[in-house]
UniProtKB/Swiss-Prot annotation:
SMART domains, alphabetized: AICARFT_IMPCHas (SM00798), MGS (SM00851)
Species name: Xanthomonas euvesicatoria pv. vesicatoria (strain 85-10)
EC numbers: 2.1.2.3, 3.5.4.10
Protein's gene: purH
Name of the protein: Bifunctional purine biosynthesis protein PurH
Family: Belongs to the PurH family.
GO MF, one annotated term: IMP cyclohydrolase activity
InterPro entries reported for this sequence: AICAR_Tfase_dup_dom_sf, Cytidine_deaminase-like, MGS-like_dom, MGS-like_dom_sf, PurH-like
Length: 527
């Protein structure tokens, strides 16, 4: 087994991203490390006044085919793969010199192919061949060789060389090896995903299928979780390699206990719901369902109205705001109720200071961003369900009035508010709302009319008046009984997708009760 610490005497540098290259090369030269390099990397090092030897000089074989072949040579791979204490004789016989450090990043395939005008030819030319081969050779031989794949690794690498008099530890070499294999896997996955989605290879800029023949996913571990969905289950949180700006995965935890699986699942539901509103809004979630949502003049006003919907369920809930959380609102929340997680795009200093008095409360900051997830996925037994994300919004102009009475301006505003909330309630979903606040929420029932009754019951428990409210349903009413129940509760307007074979009966029921009803033509099932 190789020594724990091994010196770096010779390094091969070949990078597409030249960030930090010259500083790294200069530091290595200062330690009398011999530099080998290729193409543009060698040119950059040479122009910085540093000594460097071209790989072509090492191999005696020129770069060819516009740089496609330059490092695919036994003198390169033998120098990376040669084992200490095993291969010295054969290396000496064939004139192979050991390479102790490989610094390499790959052709920018990912950044090139995300461009809308990327041609298939451009994509193919940015598939690196020699780079991944060298990374694999160096990473496999971590017992002797170190490999760096990212400029972010340079500082730590140089720091260890400084502390250990020009040597790298076995632990550092192994960690760098794992990172290199991960990078190669990510790179190959990106190539596979791109090519698998090409619908017609004869097109210069190919049409790409939204559901390719094969999917390769890459997620990076962020943290171990307190536990899974239940305490007897373990859990961890992984982030997409390229997270969408503004989504939950970009959060920063400012304080609080370890997060659990349920914390993050509920936080995602709360955050996705609240970020669809422009005015100050508060969403309170319990077991992945909004139990109170409101828009107000500020965070404090929105919180008071959302909390009033269902104070019982709000206990131990997840609270999300779409504006900077002020100190007064933070104090009002934490003095009143037990909170699992607070979420906001930012916090006033006073809000954070007050939160420290409740040290167990998890405080998450999610930077503003308008990005939307393009897909939703769900694991089933030995399989994956994949669909385009439900990012469909609704405007007033898209609503179809189907009853004799049209909703008035105030009702229209409340209908759109309730519709936005219903999208994030588990099916069957019913939402009662008035004045841009929820009055009652019925979630997750097998019968739609039962969900409507639960929404009314919740309003009664909270001592809120349903009369004059509007109702949103995530899917059509199969029978008129849902409208009859709404009328009995005092509902004045309804928003629903429509599309039932009994729409005529449902519309007639609304007309009988003087209820205004609009169809969206869009369903929002959520399971």
């Amino acid at each position: 087994m190789a020594s724990d610490f091994l010196p770096v005497r010779r390094a091969l540098l070949s990078v597409s991203d030249k960030t930090g290259l010259i500083d790294l090369a200069r530091a290595l030269v200062a330690r009398n490390v011999e530099l080998l390099s290729t193409g543009g990397t060698a040119k950059a090092i040479r122009e910085a006044g540093l000594p460097v030897k071209d790989v072509a000089e090492l191999t005696g074989f020129p770069e060819m085919m516009d740089g496609r072949v330059k490092t695919l040579h036994p003198l390169v791979h033998g120098g990376l793969l040669g084992r200490a204490g095993v291969d010295e004789a054969v290396m000496a016989e064939h004139g192979i010199v050991p390479i102790d450090l490989l610094v390499l990043n790959l052709y920018p395939f990912e950044s090139v192919t995300v461009k809308a005008d990327c041609t298939l030819a451009d994509a193919v030319e940015n598939i690196d061949i020699g780079g991944p081969a060298m990374l694999r050779s160096a990473a496999k031989n971590f017992a002797r060789v170190a490999v760096a794949t990212d400029p972010a690794q340079y500082a730590d690498l140089l720091a260890e060389l400084e502390v250990n008099d020009g040597q790298l530890s076995a632990a550092k070499r192994f960690a760098l090896s794992v990172a290199a294999f991960n990078r190669v896997a990510q790179y190959d996955a990106a190539i596979s995903n791109y090519l698998s989605a090409v619908a017609d290879s004869s097109e210069a800029v190919p049409t790409r299928s939204p559901f390719p023949a094969q999917i390769n996913s890459n997620f990076v571990k962020v943290m171990d979780l307190r536990y899974g969905e239940n305490p007897h289950q373990s859990g961890a949180f992984y982030r997409d390699l390229y997270p969408v700006p503004g989504t939950l995965a970009t959060f920063q935890q400012l304080q609080g206990k370890e997060l659990s699986y349920n914390n993050l699942a509920d936080a995602d539901a709360a955050w996705e719901c609240v970020r669809q509103f422009d005015a100050p809004a508060c969403v309170i979630v319990k077991h992945a369902n909004p139990c109170g949502v409101a828009v107000g003049a500020g965070c404090g006003d929105a919180y008071e109205l959302a909390y009033a919907t269902d104070p019982t369920s709000a206990f131990g809930g997840i609270l999300a705001f779409n504006k900077t959380l002020d100190a007064a609102t933070a104090k009002a929340i934490l003095d009143r109720q037990f909170v699992e997680v607070l979420i906001a795009p930012d916090y006033e200093a006073g809000a954070l200071e007050y939160a420290t008095r409740k040290a167990n409360v998890r405080v998450l900051k999610i930077p503003h961003g308008n990005g939307l997830n393009n897909y939703d996925t769900k694991r089933i037994g030995s399989g994956l369900l994949m669909q385009s994300a439900d990012n469909r919004s609704m405007s007033l102009g898209e609503l179809s009035v189907v009853t004799q009475r049209a909703p008035n301006e105030a009702e229209l505003g409340d209908l759109l508010f309730a519709w936005r909330v219903a999208k994030y309630v588990k099916s069957n979903a019913i939402v009662y709302a008035k004045d841009s606040r929820t009055i009652g929420v019925g979630a997750g029932q097998m019968s739609r009319v039962v969900s409507a009754k639960i929404a009314a019951l919740k309003a009664e428990e909270a001592k809120l008046t349903v009369a004059g409210s509007v109702m949103a349903s995530d899917a059509f009413f199969p029978f008129r009984d849902g409208i009859d129940a709404a009328a009995a509760a005092g509902i004045k307007a309804v928003i629903q997708p429509g599309g039932s074979m009994r729409d005529g009966e449902v519309i007639a029921a609304a007309d009988e009760h003087g209820i205004a009803m609009v169809f969206t033509g869009v369903r929002h099932f959520r399971h």
